[in-house]
Amino acid sequence: IHFAGSSSCKVDVFLPGQHSMQDKMNAAETFLGGGTDFKRPLDEAIQLMDVGFENADIVFLTDGLCELPEDYLATLRKEQAARKFTVTGILLDAGSPGMDFSLTPFCQKIYRTSELAGDEIVRSMVSQRV
C-alpha cells in the first residue's frame, strides 16, 4: 500500500504466480507526491484482512510524521486485539534520527534506518517471525 497525503493511496497485491518482476519494479518506483497520512493506508491494510489476508501483520514503512486522533487509535487497537495482528514500523529517519513518536502509538516494534541497515532490519524481522 503506497501512501502520501489523505487523497493519495495505491494498493498493489502480489499473489504467488500472479505478478511479474516488472509489476514489482513498478510498485517499487511508485511515488504519490508529498504529504503523509497514516489513517488511509492503515484502513486499507485492515480491509485487505477481510479479503484473504486474515492472518497478516502490517509492516509500516514511512519517512514522515503524522498524528492520529486518539479515537482512531482506540479503534485501531480494538481491531488489533480482535484480529490478532501486529504493526511493525520501519522509520526512514537517516536524516533525523529518533523521530519515532508518530509511530509509537500503534507500532509494536519500530526499526530505524538511522540505527540499522536495511538488511539488518530484514534479518531481525524474519528471525522474530520464524
List PLM regions with ranges.
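Glycine-rich phosphate-binding loop signature in dinucleotide/nucleotide-binding domains
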Residues: 49-54
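Short beta-strand-loop
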Residues: 1-28, 48, 98-102
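Short, conserved alpha-helix that lines the donor NDP-sugar binding/gating region
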Residues: 38, 42, 46
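Generic recognition of flexible, low-complexity loop/linker segments
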Residues: 45-48, 75-76
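VWA/integrin I-like adhesion module and closely mimicked acidic/polar interface patches used
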Residues: 29-36, 64-115
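C-terminal "exit" segments of structured domains
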Residues: 117-130
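Von Willebrand factor
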Residues: 1-17, 41-42, 57-61, 90-94
